[in-house]
UniProtKB/Swiss-Prot annotation:
Pathway: Amino-acid biosynthesis; L-arginine biosynthesis; L-ornithine from N(2)-acetyl-L-ornithine (linear): step 1/1. The gene is argE. InterPro entries: AcOrn-deacetyl, ArgE/DapE_CS, Bact_exopeptidase_dim_dom, Peptidase_M20, Peptidase_M20_dimer, Peptidase_M20A. This is Acetylornithine deacetylase. It is found in: Cytoplasm. Zn(2+) 2 binds at D108, E141, H351. It comes from the Bacteria. It comes from Vibrio vulnificus (strain YJ016).
Amino acid sequence: MQLPSFLDVYRGLISTSSISSSDPSWDQGNQAVIEKLSDWFSALGFDVDVTEVEPGKYNLLAQKGQGEGGLLLAGHSDTVPFDQGRWSFDPHQLTEKDNKFYGLGTADMKGFFAFIYEAAKRMDWKGQNKPLYVLATCDEETTMLGARHFSAHTPFKPDYCIIGEPTSLVPVRGHKGHVANVVRVTGKSGHSSDPSLGVNAIEIMHEVLFALMQLRDTLIKQYHNPGFAIPSPTLNLGHIHGGDSANRICGCCELHYDVRPLPGISLDGLDNLLRGALKEVEAKWPGRIEIVPLHEPIPGYECQHDHPFIHGIEDLCGTPSQTVNYCTEAPFLQQLCPTLVLGPGSIDQAHQPDEFLAFDFIDPTIDVLSKAMRKYCF
């Protein structure tokens, strides 16, 4: 049987929609793309296991070789939705133009599996003494369901892991976490001519905002990591809505905010800080303030700066590692083994109309992956 080419695999990945979204009208599941990956890696001699994590949501683990340790190459099989009407090309067809691949998932990050496939296809596996694993997860763009499930249930313990998010082939050794909450204030509506008739939720929210701003200052003073461009945790007030009319006492007000904690700040500790900041306001207004997570929190992540794995990958790439402010599945896979984020394409193209990956990344990415396989599986 003739094996598909790099371009065949790339086209197949992009043409197989696998959008995940908290909006049910967009959410599709990833079964079709997982089935294609299963066929392709099985044809290369990998042992493939597919796990249904939730209905319609699948993880794939492909294994080449036996033994302890080895290398895990990981990525997510889902994409974000796309902005209808704002793309110059069909987002679900791979378009080659101006020395770039255009399409949804070209950079973030289904296309990475085509690079793994091509590197594995070219590899001479004689002398392999440690396994190579390929992990394709579900729902990274929403809940990180696939990575959470894999790290909690896999019996395998690779020596090292590379996640192929778009980093322009610069190794990433750490990133901040992400916590997003809703604060809901329930007041009591009434006619604005007599404030005593109600409880104004906006006025209570004003006290909540003051407490959160004090917490933001505390986080900046107490936590600092010079390895990050923004060296302290950030707290952002992202969305607020309250009331419905100028002549009514506001009965409900809702705030969405997020915090991006540094590595080393525990999620439980951060939650205690957040709730402690609002303790006085809640005591003043019992039963009127509710805090609800927008999604499962994601911890910060950092691979130990002087770890030999970092130095090894820096040598392969010819560039020093760095830290970033966006999130990946690394905090969960790091629970299994030292983990770095390294992949083709730029994060600047992620989640954008006309997402693309430049042809300039093709040969260097295959080369780096081939060298990593050779270094950690032979």
